[in-house]
From Swiss-Prot:
This is Delta-like protein B. Residues 159-203 form the DSL domain. GO terms for cellular component: plasma membrane. Pfam families: DSL, EGF, EGF_DL_JAG, hEGF, MNNL.
Length: 615
């Protein structure tokens, strides 16, 4: 068994299974033996079986037949010989190795029945021969003869490739096709020969038209030329311009390289407008200014954007002193009235004897001829015929009104300005209009006061009434303090605006008479502790206020910054503090402390803010 396993492994290792196919054929031409295997009275039936194996140094008749096996049909034979038989075919599906071992056996069939295994009885074996041969693939038959001890066998064999297989080992597969997988035929050696219009290893690549660009074109069938994205033209050699490009070229897709004389993103701006359009008429000179613009320099006598208009030189009234103008080609002439001459009738032919100066002007003769008028201060002109307007140059600033007085000009200033030309803004804060330490900001004929805390009005002369908005809730009484409103709450309420009820909360917390439940006892204990805590807090607050009052009294007994001011105020200045008789302001660290002697009515007390100040 071990020998058989090793034999099988060796057989498999020698066989190179590939996609190949072929046929081994063997023909028995004659067989004779000295042994008698037939009865004398009749002919016998025999058949031949072959076993094709890989090449072995010592040929074993034992299976397996690694390359394949085959046998003839049952043949009729005479007493000791047999004539030729049909070929035995052994197909194989591997790469033909070129060497092989061959075992040929002759068997007695006992009867002419075909489908019966006569090899189970070794007594039916007539002869067996084994040989090792080298055989190349081809259609030619190899003749061979084998001489045994008592037999002679003549036979021939060959190996040829199956259809669609080629090569020395029948390992080259080539099947002609004309579909999506290829378009080719096969030559005698199994090489693919592409059909017309196809190329490539599998003849699956169509051959495009001869002028089709290899880089920018492609085809799906022979003779076509389809362009890739960004290219166009019959041969796909023209790049596609940027969309909207008018006068540009490209070397790569989506470019817009402007041609000479054109510019802009889309090459739609004519940079050489003069050459391309010649817009200037009448011999004018055209100059490109870029971005499709130009200017025309006109010849004398012409005007307009394109010099298309002929200018009448008389339109500008060049003739002076009442002369009449005559238009000429690119020129003019003046017909001067009596007493004037020159190109524009600008030269006066009159003399001082003609009394040419008006409005009191003085005439003086000139050595070169003619005269000159010396005008009085309020007139001007060659003959002092024009009245001089001294307000024409607008001498008054800041909206001042100019009044021409003849020899001079007068400026009437707007309210808030002064000066000969109204150039000075009057300082409206110079007279200190802001009261009660307010800060003044000058404006134009106006001022603005920034009032200190507790005062209001245009000049900060009015006390601010912080109680106008009625901030105190639940019947609280409002008092005006310089720091804002102060609320005196009625019993049962507390807070800066008397917004928190006090008695209602305590009534809800107090237990009803006659209830002795454990929860009531617990609430009573809590209320007792809370009452003790509140009493301690109230005592501390009262003690702190007394100390603060004493400290303020000590501070107000002194005069800070070496300044003491005593103000005796009447009732109308302090309507809210009627009985003040003396106020001492003391300045310390930017704060104001007030000490006052005051007689309070019965049942009334001072109110103090959280900072300790009088409210």
């Amino acid at each position: 068994m071990a020998h058989l396993s090793l034999y099988c492994l060796l057989s498999v290792s020698l066989l190179q299974l590939v996609a190949s196919s072929g046929v081994f054929e063997l023909k028995v031409h004659s067989f004779s033996t000295t042994r008698r295997f037939c009865r004398r009275t009749r002919d016998c039936n025999i058949f031949f079986r072959i076993c094709l194996k890989h090449s072995e140094d010592v040929i074993s008749a034992e299976p397996p037949c690694t390359f394949g096996t085959g046998q003839t049909s049952v043949l009729r034979a005479d007493q000791s010989s047999i004539a030729s038989s049909a070929a035995i075919r052994v197909p194989f599906h591997f790469k033909w190795p070129g060497t092989f071992s061959l075992i040929i056996e002759a068997w007695n069939a006992e009867s002419p029945k075909e489908h019966h295994d006569y090899t189970e009885n070794q007594n039916n074996l007539i002869s067996r021969l084994a040989t090792r041969r080298r055989l190349a693939v081809g259609e030619d038959w190899s003749q061979d003869v084998h001489f045994g001890d008592q037999s002679e066998l003549r036979y021939s064999y060959h190996v040829f490739c199956d259809e669609f297989y080629f090569g020395e080992a029948c390992s080259d597969y080539c099947r002609p096709r004309d579909d999506t997988l290829g378009h080719y035929t096969c030559d005698e050696n199994g090489n693919k020969e592409c059909l017309v219009g196809w190329q490539g290893d599998y003849c699956s690549d169509p051959i495009c038209s001869s002028d089709c660009s290899e880089r920018h074109g492609y085809c799906e069938s022979p003779g076509e030329c389809k362009c890739r994205l960004g290219w166009q033209g019959p041969s796909c050699s023209e790049c596609v311009h940027y969309p909207g490009c008018l006068h540009g070229t490209c070397s790569q897709p989506w470019q817009c390289v402007c041609k000479e004389g054109w510019g802009g993103l889309f090459c739609n701006q004519d940079l050489n407008y003069c050459t391309n359009h010649k817009p200037c008429a009448n011999g004018a000179t055209c100059t490109n200014t870029g971005q499709g613009s130009y200017t025309c320099t006109c010849r004398p006598g012409f005007g307009g954007t394109n010099c298309e208009l002929e200018i009448n030189e008389c339109d500008c009234n060049p003739c002076k002193n009442g002369g009449s103008c005559n238009d000429l080609e690119n020129d003019y002439s003046c017909t001067c009235p009596q007493g004037f001459y020159g190109k524009n009738c600008e030269i006066i032919a009159m003399t001082c004897a003609d009394d040419p100066c008006f409005n009191g002007g003085t005439c003086e003769e000139k050595f070169t001829g003619g005269y000159v008028c010396r005008c009085p201060p309020t007139f001007t002109g060659s003959n002092c015929e024009k009245r001089l307007d001294r307000c024409s140059h607008k001498p008054c600033a800041n909206g001042g009104e100019c009044v021409d007085l003849g020899a001079s000009a007068l400026c009437r200033c707007r309210p808030g300005f002064s000066g000969s030309r109204c150039e000075t803004n009057i300082d409206d804060c110079a007279r200190y209009p802001c009261q009660n330490a307010g800060t003044c900001q000058d404006g134009i004929n106006d001022y603005t006061c920034t009032c200190t805390l507790g005062f209001t009005g245009k000049n900060c002369s009015l006390r601010a009434d912080a109680c106008l908005t009625n901030p105190c809730l639940h019947g609280g009484t409002c008092f005006t303090h310089f720091s804002g409103p102060v609320c005196q709450c009625v019993p049962g309420f507390m807070g800066s605006t008397c917004e928190f009820p006090v008695q209602a909360s305590l009534e809800k917390m107090a237990p009803r008479v006659g209830q002795t439940s454990p929860s009531a006892v617990a609430v009573s204990c809590v209320l007792g502790v809370l009452a003790v805590f509140l009493g301690v807090c109230v005592g501390l607050v009262v003690l702190r206020r007394r100390r603060h009052r004493l400290r303020r009294q000590q501070l107000c007994d002194s005069v800070f910054n070496d300044l003491e001011t005593v103000n005796n105020l009447d009732r109308q200045h302090y309507p809210y503090d009627r009985d003040f008789s003396q106020v001492k302001p003391c300045n310390t660290e930017g704060r104001i402390s007030l000490a006052a002697s005051h007689t309070l009515p019965a049942g009334q007390e001072f109110l103090w803010s959280a900072g300790g100040g009088l409210r």
